[in-house]
């Protein structure tokens, strides 16, 4: 008996089936709002577009809160950082197979003309934003008929499942055993109004699938005989506590906090950054005297909106330390967002950063990108296996996959390609002939940036050599000299440099 049979046989008249369909996994209940914030942050939509992700002030009126939501602004750092990852990971990806049908499928994996690389970019973007995303490898239940059958062969197609759409799941020692996702109701005509509250359900286990409409009625059911659930879960950072979900690249609550700080700054600047014109009058001034002052101001200054007290005229301004504190907190949150992505928002001076700190920063980012590249490699091969499970029923999918000789190669180096550009920039600076002192400092910084992982004693020795060098000792090395010396140092430490053999 499959894991979804209970829902199929449940009575719909009593509402039991719909109640079971609406049931969600406890982990889903715990993380759902956080996942939605992450997805909204990546696309700049949802609560970041409507202002719903703003936190109301303790004593804020409904009108003031609505006004603040209307004026809210969102700076999309999440999209910028995630797209940086996508560009690095999906550049120069190579695919090979002896199966021409698979090659054709790679050019259109969703039935809408989307190539495999673009599809995976979209799935990975959602996974990085929210922590995980699913990809359903589905197939039309019946083969196409009619004159176009030869041109439109039946073949699998991919569907991205956002984490907020995967309502429930079961995992055992073999992996994913069953999954329940929510899906939109079929598209209606332009003259009808769509109801976003009306969604259906799609269920899969290792033997069958079933689809239910928004009322809970069974609309379709079938047996797929794959022996596996055709859903692959992409988790860039797997959760340590939950085997099904992952962790977002950037904590969504931090992005939401930054969004709120921007709104709070606007409130302070708009409603509190003002000057109050104060006119002081003598203590013995009468009401007539005060009215005379108002008329005089209206005629001479152009305003009668003033505060009148005893003394001399003055401007009183609000204390702007609050705005400065909010802005400083925004800078801190932005730096934290970049730090979570293993990047630096503001590069401190080279002298302020230790060689160990720079080395660890580069190493951390490089290792993160490498692990993601390995993940994408394995994920894409898993997608190819599900493709052959559909194309060769009867448990022959793995054999067909092996015969196809599928190979996928993702980039494995992410920092070394910048070496030549770094060398050229520093060599050009040295060649400016800025004088002995400036040239020595430039050379120190060049070594510091190009070789951040040197041992402290080695870095100290190099620094002393540069300090002790005289003007005629090759301080103004040309670009080729500097390039060759840096390459030799890297090779001495076992680091291979592209093109070094030719040099």
Residue map of PLM features:
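C-terminal helix-loop subdomains that flank or include functional centers
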Residues: 292-305, 332-503
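Polar/charged side chains located within well-ordered beta-strands of beta-rich proteins
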Residues: 7, 17, 194, 199-201, ...
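Extended, charged amphipathic alpha-helical segments
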Residues: 219-357
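Short secondary-structure capping micro-motifs at structural edges
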Residues: 119-124, 321-325, 364-372
